[in-house]
Amino acid sequence: MKPRIMMISMKSNLRTMRYIGLLLMFIFCLTAQNMMAQRGKLFNSDNQLSSNLATQVFQDSNGFIWIATRNGLNIYDGYNFMVIRKAYNNSNGLNSNYINCITQDEKGRIVLGTNKSLLILNGKRFSNVPMLDSRNKPINTYVTQVSRLHNGDIAVVTSGYGIMTKKTDANACYTMKGEVENLKYIHKILEDKQERLWIILENGKLLRKEKNGKLVSRIMGTEQLNTQDIRQDDKGNIYLATKNEGVYL
């Protein structure tokens, strides 16, 4: 009887091992499937995107993805790209293929900064927004960032003419008044939850415009930093990405 019992045990063990093996294979297949699902898809100039040099990715209030490139504007609906380029025979189109930055205003219109102007997309028509310097003279300048502020204004960051503002219903863009008017070469800005404006100059120096307009030029702990980017989390903490000192909190 003992040999028979041993055979039953061996068969039982084989069934158990087979079951475990099948279970492990099933888990492996699920894991592999999840890994495949998480794998990114590359879009470049050989695959739908108009240029390999992309400067910003922006998602609008309807969920569409807008991509600024050095060869036109790309719009992605989750399935396909639509590319908009400068049309020399179309006065209502892009006036440049050199798109630097994107945001959306209070009315839901897309706002673009190019290498020489500020544009607003009204339906299918691009409108050029006149940019006026501190003497109210028209200028053409390199727009490096567009950002919607808490009051609905669009802050327009330029290289050479400082920070400008475009009010929702205004037909032009004007130099931001106050102490910040003396700042000309701006790299990046961030308006925090307290409505203070953090300003990174092109040389990496960090400044802050208080809500009352006062400009703070010495921010403790940042004097020696070469700041490249700035972000704020949901708790209000400010993070600085620096050139040689890592991330500063």
Predicted stretch roles:
Residues 1-249:
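Carboxylate-rich, polar loop motifs that coordinate divalent cations or form catalytic acidic clusters
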